Amino acid sequence: MFIHQADNWTNFVWDKDKISDKLMQVMQALGYMHGRLSMLGFEEQLKATAESITAEIVSTSQIEGITLKTNSVRSSVARRLGVPADGVAESISHDVEGIVTVELDATHNYSQPLTHERLFNWHNELFPIDRRKHYQIDIGQYRTHGMQVVSGNMGRERVHYQAPEAQRVPQEMEIFLNWYNDATIAASPLKAAIAHFWFVCIHPFDD
């Protein structure tokens, strides 16, 4: 049985004793970071923010097996944030521009409601129009077929996880978004962790 096949599967529970120390470390690190930033001038804060966003985009892309040119990402982020560029400007691909667009919207407009349409727009940005002919997937919409996490050679595959059936995805995402946008549930590292796990379990998009 996969998690989404259980009754009330989104009623997540966790062991507070096992995560309390980690959560405290995260909150202390956040406090330290905000304290350091507050000591910087406005321009230095922008530069620090640009470097942080650049590093996150590059490292997140590597997790997905995508290697981006750090200088190209930095140039795109700096231009969007109005940070003076150092050295020769890098040429910026559509791939980089799309990923930067998604990252900046997510990090700078985090107080805006997360909607189906916003997620569709993010998915569109990740697959530039000039390269879509290379992808045999649904883009800018929820997937219309099954999704599995599989390893192994062809004919000897091992299914590690099977996501909810495609016809369930819109309703599952509606439940998820209602929870995510609930103002009575305060933003926190724990909420972010639950949201990440929940979203991955649904796996609503092709990739």
Question: Which sequence ranges carry the predicted segments?
Answer:
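FIC/Doc superfamily catalytic core
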Residues: 1-207
